[in-house]
């Protein structure tokens, strides 16, 4: 084999190894590449209880209930809804009808226990498919409801 031929074989083998390494890395990071999953994706993919993930969608109107530091609410994408329980201080932008991303684990009963909650201020953080589905159903609110116009938060008895 000539010197030029050996060089081509060496370069080809190096590129093959790099492609294989990139494929293995992407395969290992598959679940963390997606910023969040919608309630419909969680229902369709049959996510195992205890699996850590990020759940994103809109806070369903009339679903927020506060009891001390525990807040329960429902996240919807218009097709499916997941009940979320969060213990902690909610972000200032959190309100009904507004976009939210909750990070935590799915529970055996199908609810979601969030460790952290991020309020989204616009559609930039929502997948185009979710935004389009909400617009088609007439549930999309550009920028969310104006301050003071959201439905009042329900208080649990005795809180």
From Swiss-Prot:
Topological domains annotated Cytoplasmic: 1-7
Pfam family, one: CcmE
Transmembrane intervals: 8-28
Membrane side Periplasmic: residue ranges: 29-159
GO cellular component: plasma membrane
Matching HAMAP family: CcmE
InterPro entries, alphabetized: CcmE, CcmE-like_sf, NA-bd_OB-fold
Protein's name in the database: Cytochrome c-type biogenesis protein CcmE
Purpose of the protein: Heme chaperone required for the biogenesis of c-type cytochromes. Transiently binds heme delivered by CcmC and transfers the heme to apo-cytochromes in a process facilitated by CcmF and CcmH.
Region annotation Disordered: where it falls in the sequence: 134-159
MF term (GO), any: heme binding
Family, as annotated: Belongs to the CcmE/CycJ family.
Record keywords, A-Z: Cell inner membrane, Cell membrane, Cytochrome c-type biogenesis, Heme, Iron, Membrane, Metal-binding, Signal-anchor, Transmembrane, Transmembrane helix
Compartments it resides in: Cell inner membrane
Gene3D superfamilies: Nucleic acid-binding proteins (2.40.50.140)
UniProt keyword Chaperone present: no
Primary gene name: ccmE
Residues annotated as binding heme: 121, 125
Membrane topology qualifier: Single-pass type II membrane protein
Signal sequence bounds: none
